[in-house]
Amino acid sequence: LRRNAELLTEKLAAYGVRGRVDEIHPGPVVTMYEFEPQSGTKVSKIAGLADDLAMALAAQKVRIVAPIAGKARVGFELPNDIRQTVPLREILEDRRWEKHGGALPVALGKDIGGQPVYADLSKMPHLLVAGATGSGKSVGLNVMLTSILAKKTPDEVRMLMVDPKVVELQVFDGIPHMLLPVVTDMKKAALALRWAVDEMERRYQMFADAGTRNIDTYNRRVERVLSGDLAVDKFMPKRKGKVSAQDANGQEVLLDPADGESPDAENFEPEKLPYIVVVVDEFADLMMVAAKDVEACIARLAQKARASGIHVILATQRPSVDVITGMIKANFPARVAFKVSQRQDSMTILGRSGAEHLLGMGDMLMIPPGASDLQRVHAAYVSEDEVRVVCDFLREQGDPEYQQEILKPREDDGPGGESDDPLYDKAVAVVANAGYCSISHVQRQLSVGYNKAAKLVELMEQEGVVGPPSSKAGGRREVLVGPL
């Protein structure tokens, strides 16, 4: 390392940059040399020497960090002669992983100093991953998902996976954490994303009814009910004033009576909500099939889903501007770039160059949540056989409870013609037996989105099952049929 430091100093002097190497930080793949230039040296002069130094040092790639944040030094990252593999098992057996208390802990790998790097997906709150073929992107994605599965039970986290390549995520099929079998049909993938948006809206309505703001406080409140510390009838506090939203036709609809207890409080049985991780392995393919619908769903989830406990991981090997649009990029502050083929791809994913100089095979740059400086990490490695062993073990613990209604097509042509919908009869039974009609009540009882529940209520009004909203009753609809 000292010899390399002397050689680096010598080559820099040949280009008119004088100074000395003060510190050396060896890592599993690259070694960082902290170089302190002489006073008066322009940083821009050093930053443009990456390719020249790579040739002079006979190195595969040289990445320059100019300057190092908080220091009057410039960092030179030179590849090691012998790369070290970072096994995922080694990362997961570290004490720091055992003590990691995040809601969605993710193991990433080791930094350039050889220290384990962990993150919490719930704090990110969404992650954008890009990398060219052979960069290690798919293995890195497997590492992230496997680390979550190793830490969290199906009651704590559920997963919805979209795999246009068909083979990349199939190993996870059938584990109890899955909401659905891995989705490979792109048209069904759009339906799955729309369901995630509906589920987000449903959860926010539940939070509003319970007087909470996010999934964490909601689940803590549920725990109090289950432990007997909080009465069920106190779970939903009184709400004053008109609570409304727009239905599918743009009309204002009252969600619940304007005064008094939420009508569902007596019959409502609170349950803890699991976090949901939505994984899209090749986002570019999905955008080619249904760009408009997909982008709108991803943007809504990225903007609002954090507090509801729904988090998105998008991965693509083609980080062009037509795939990672400005709307998507603006809502994914945490991003990971494996090696890309050109500078423009690095600019698209990270907002700056650098990813084109990575070494591949798990070498990556990361923008941590809430930070502006890039962090270089070498991703942990997990083999396909190791992932299969983990998934086989999970399958032995129990069968998945699939929610096949996720992939049922939505009827967006208005309420007409939905009387053949099997949910319609269930909705009629719900309001008839309850003796009142509330869109939020139908939402919760049928586990559907707000728009779907609003359409069912409109159809029941057309069929004479319920009356129109009454302003005197605070928007309450009269049920015109008896209990079933």
Which residue ranges define each predicted feature?
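Primarily NTPase-proximal linker/entry elements flanking Walker-type ATP/GTP-binding cores
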Residues: 1-135, 143, 147, 175, ...
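Hydrophobic face of alpha-helices
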Residues: 2-5, 47-50, 142, 190-193, ...
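P-loop NTPase motor-domain active sites and their immediate coupling elements
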Residues: 40, 72-105, 110-118, 123-124, ...
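P-loop NTPase switch/communication element
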Residues: 122, 149-192, 327-328
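Walker A/P-loop
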Residues: 138
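Alpha-helical transmembrane segments of multipass membrane proteins
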Residues: 147-148, 286
